A protein has these predicted regions:
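N-terminal active-site segment of His-dependent metallophosphoesterases
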Residues: 1-82
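Extended active-site neighborhood of metal-dependent phosphoesterases/phosphodiesterases
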Residues: 3-9, 70-192
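Active-site-proximal beta-strand elements of phosphoester/diester hydrolases
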Residues: 18-28, 151-161, 199
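Residue-level recognition of the N-termini of beta-strands and the immediately preceding loop/turn
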Residues: 19, 52, 57, 150-154, ...
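Active-site neighborhood of phospho(di)ester-bond hydrolases with catalytic His/Asp-centered motifs
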Residues: 22-25, 53-58, 90, 94-100, ...
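Active-site environment of divalent metal-dependent phosphoester hydrolases
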Residues: 30-32, 61-64, 96-108, 162-165, ...
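Short, glycine/charged-enriched secondary-structure capping and boundary segments
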Residues: 36-38, 68-70, 110-113, 212-214
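Active-site-proximal segments of metal-dependent phosphoesterases and phosphodiesterases across multiple
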Residues: 72-73, 191-215
Length: 215
């Protein structure tokens, strides 16, 4: 069974069996990046000392007016670099998914943004399978400390962008099929289902089914 498109470079558990993931969500900034945000990220990294950082979408706000004029490519790249640099300068591996605001309005394409992210040596994200919905669907194996066994896996799925009517999109059936293919590939390779986490920006619509109205 062949590995589905989107496999990223593997990471390893520490010898003591630990692996710490730090999630950074919705920084929603522009090239005029908040110094407080950048400082906060740096202090959080120093406090938590993660083995992997996962940005879970809306790193930038494509609707930001500072992107409306001038060189958008340059400004968006600057915004991404400002947010990611605290992670990269500490040589911490990181990956990301896109949110509904990253390529909205004055933003640039996800393909162009991926190039900026991939310019950082510690970026693990992959563009993913071009034949399915979304951009950047990928997965990361977490190996045993000796690198011999796949003990854990992280899936990262693009939950797509806002639709023209203003509603948020949802993960597609073909993306779910891709996930199942990767899951089954890992089972075939290891002999059992691999414990996993899945990161995406927009929650699945089914979450509404478990919500209850309260007084």
């Amino acid at each position: 069974m062949a590995s589905p498109i989107g496999k990223a470079k593997s990471l390893k558990f520490k010898k003591d069996g630990t692996f710490r993931i730090m999630q950074i969500a919705d920084t929603q900034d522009t090239n005029i990046t908040s110094k407080n945000t950048v400082e906060f990220i740096g202090k959080a990294l120093d406090s938590e000392n993660p083995d992997l950082v996962v940005f879970t979408g809306d790193q930038i706000k494509g609707y930001g007016l500072s992107f409306a004029t001038g060189n958008r490519d340059k400004k968006v790249a600057e915004a991404i670099r400002n947010i990611v640099t605290p992670v990269a300068e500490r040589n911490i591996p990181f990956t990301f998914v896109f949110g509904n605001h990253d390529d909205q309005a004055f933003g640039i394409s996800k393909e162009k943004q991926m190039i900026v992210y991939k310019s950082f040596p510690t970026c693990l994200a992959e563009p993913g399978d071009p034949s399915i919905s979304g951009y950047g669907n990928h997965y990361i194996n977490i190996l045993s400390s000796d690198g011999k066994k796949i003990l854990f896996n992280i899936y990262l799925i693009d939950s797509l962008s806002a639709s023209l009517d203003g509603h948020c999109s949802a993960v597609s059936e073909e993306q779910i099929a891709w996930y199942k293919s990767a899951r089954d590939y890992l089972k075939d390779k290891t002999g059992d289902y691999v414990p996993s986490l899945l990161f995406q920006h927009i929650p699945v619509p089914e979450m509404w089914n478990v919500l209850k109205e309260v007084p």
